[in-house]
């Protein structure tokens, strides 16, 4: 379909009157076939593996080998202020910015994470964007895509199967019998199993379970539980690996438990790492989709930012930067967690340097941070959020200033994107603009939800200006900074804490990690709530004077991350009383899914 025809049809879509899934359904009638999209991007026919008409896997290794001497395009990260539980439109802004850069005639790509079934069927939705700034096709994107998260789940759970089988066989059999089966007794301490099972749903009743309650042949009885698949170390590995050989090596380093002599038990010790890698073989290549206006979007990996690394894959960004002049990637939640991990983990491991960071701001979130009433998903918004209130906005700007400071600490040029909502007033917008500009950030008001790329040209122009200015990108901490000092640096300089406290188990693990040589110098992946700069989701605005409580420290040797856990956050979220799955259904006449967003 010609560009003019596509634009004509887009003008018929009204996000005020239509739901996201209705817009997506209409827009999918004039998507580019993925082979056309790939050709426009500069991919050859043998570099794509089509999955239907509109989705393809891309052979990242082949493309990177072919384009190894081509310079990278401009690298842009989209982050946000601390959101309300409803989200502030970061994925929508990512799609809108990609479309806006397209309107300026730029060769542009985007990269976002694959949505987890947990939030898709729970509260937050599928993270495809919204209105006239979406990633399409919506139903496949939201409902498993090409099976990458399923592959991660199966790979992770295979390690647990191997561990459980080994515990059972060692408990039931003599050393002589084990030797006849070519097994050496590992003498695993069942009280020190580091892994749980994985499931890609929000299932709070599975956080803590007892397993193996049958007889001698029914497994090994022990406490266990489930985490959501996107919190798995295997998912983190999919985000950070750089080649198939790198992936294979990492899969053998995952620590699943400890022996009674305090030695770690790895997936390689269980001889399951090769099979785990085999399960991921088709998942290693990024997925190619498109915006509602036909720009290419890579979708790969799906870790949350509050309980995991929160980034799409390194290989997707490397691939896109060779193919486009501008590449827009997204990091999860606010700059305190998603951008901080993009900055100090993803960029450190990839060697890539960003040119600009976009901070998504809404008047709604600033009102919440300024002391507005509680925002509850599924409940009507308090009138404070839909009527003018400049005092709440002005007070809430302190949260925005904290995130601007975080981006500037990285030496990157910040662009504040005011994601415009219908209830916003000129006075509220002026306060946000003036405050951000006084903090030496560029500012753009964007209407991409309502107008698509046409509504994002001001943002796109601000981003290109920022990309063309020199920056002084640098990491928050050097690689050789001791772990305890590194945790305190993140807590003080990014979260605004006064200090850090540790539970006894966290102190014990800290001492063990610090005795493990280079392990303590692996990048630090903090786990904490996304609903506050602090560990406490009730503390809004720009809290100060608090101590960050570290309750546990996990070691992800395969991903190469040390993971301190702050506060009461869970690795398995819960399903709400009014989940999205109640509104999702299938039109039996057309076979199309309705109710997604």
Swiss-Prot record:
Binding site for ATP: 84-91
Pathway recorded for this protein: One-carbon metabolism; tetrahydrofolate interconversion
Annotated CDD domains: FTHFS
Keyword Disulfide bond belongs to the record: no
Pfam families in the cross-refs: FTHFS
Example of a GO MF term: ATP binding
Keywords from the UniProt entry: ATP-binding, Ligase, Nucleotide-binding, One-carbon metabolism
EC number(s) reported in the record: 6.3.4.3
Protein name from the UniProt record: Formate--tetrahydrofolate ligase
């Amino acid at each position: 379909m010609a560009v003019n025809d596509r634009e004509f049809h887009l003008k018929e879509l009204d996000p005020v009157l239509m739901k996201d899934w209705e817009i997506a359904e209409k827009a999918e009638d004039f998507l580019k076939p993925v082979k056309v999209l790939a050709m426009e991007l500069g991919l050859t026919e043998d570099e794509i593996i089509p999955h239907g008409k509109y989705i393809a896997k891309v052979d990242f290794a082949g493309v990177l080998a072919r384009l190894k001497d081509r310079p990278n395009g401009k690298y842009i990260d989209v982050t946000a202020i601390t959101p309300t539980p409803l989200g502030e439109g970061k994925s929508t802004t990512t799609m809108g910015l990609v479309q806006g850069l397209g309107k300026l005639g730029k060769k542009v790509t985007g990269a976002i994470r694959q949505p987890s079934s947990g939030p898709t069927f729970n509260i937050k939705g599928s993270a495809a964007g919204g209105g006239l700034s979406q990633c399409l096709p919506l139903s496949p994107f939201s409902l498993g895509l090409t099976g990458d998260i399923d592959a991660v789940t199966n790979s992770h759970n295979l390690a647990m199967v191997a561990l459980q089988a080994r515990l059972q066989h060692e408990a039931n059999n003599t050393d002589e019998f084990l030797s006849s089966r070519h097994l050496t007794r590992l003498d695993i301490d069942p009280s020190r199993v580091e892994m749980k099972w994985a499931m890609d749903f929000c299932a709070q009743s599975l956080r803590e379970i007892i397993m193996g309650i049958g007889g001698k042949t029914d497994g090994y009885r022990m406490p266990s539980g489930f985490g959501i698949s996107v919190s798995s170390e295997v998912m983190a590995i999919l985000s950070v690996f750089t080649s198939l050989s790198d992936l294979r090596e990492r899969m053998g380093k995952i620590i699943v438990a400890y022996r009674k002599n305090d030695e770690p038990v790895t997936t390689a010790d269980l001889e399951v790492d090769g099979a785990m890698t085999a399960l991921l073989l088709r998942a290693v290549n990024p997925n190619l989709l498109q915006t509602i206006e036909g720009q290419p979007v890579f979708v790969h990996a799906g870790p949350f930012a509050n309980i995991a690394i929160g980034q799409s894959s390194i290989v997707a960004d490397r691939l896109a930067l060779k193919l486009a002049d501008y590449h827009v990637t997204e990091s999860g939640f606010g700059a305190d967690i998603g951008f901080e991990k993009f900055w100090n983990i993803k960029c450190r491991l990839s060697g890539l340097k960003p040119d600009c960071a976009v901070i998504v701001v809404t008047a709604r979130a600033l009102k919440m941070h300024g002391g507005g009433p509680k925002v509850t998903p599924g409940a009507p918004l308090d009138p404070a959020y839909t009527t003018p209130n400049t005092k709440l906005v002005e007070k809430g700007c302190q949260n925005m200033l904290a995130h601007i400071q975080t981006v500037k600490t990285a030496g990157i040029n910040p662009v504040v994107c005011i994601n415009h909502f219908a209830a916003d007033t000129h006075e509220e917008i002026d306060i946000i603009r003036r405050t951000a500009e006084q903090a030496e950030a560029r500012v753009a008001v964007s209407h991409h939800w309502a107008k698509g790329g046409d509504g994002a040209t001001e943002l796109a122009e601000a981003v290109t200006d920022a990309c063309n200015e020199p920056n002084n990108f640098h990491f928050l901490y050097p690689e050789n900074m001791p772990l305890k000092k590194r945790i305190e640096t993140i807590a003080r300089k990014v979260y605004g804490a006064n200090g850090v406290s540790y539970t006894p188990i966290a102190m014990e693990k800290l001492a063990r990690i610090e005795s493990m040589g280079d392990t303590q110098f692996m990048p630090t992946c903090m786990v904490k709530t996304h609903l506050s700069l602090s560990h406490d989701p009730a503390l809004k605005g720009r809290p100060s004077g608090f101590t960050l409580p570290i309750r546990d420290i996990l070691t992800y040797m395969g991903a190469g991350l040390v993971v301190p856990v702050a506060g009461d956050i869970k690795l398995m979220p819960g399903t709400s009383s009014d989940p999205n799955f109640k509104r999702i259904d299938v039109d039996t006449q057309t076979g199309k899914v309705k109710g997604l967003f």
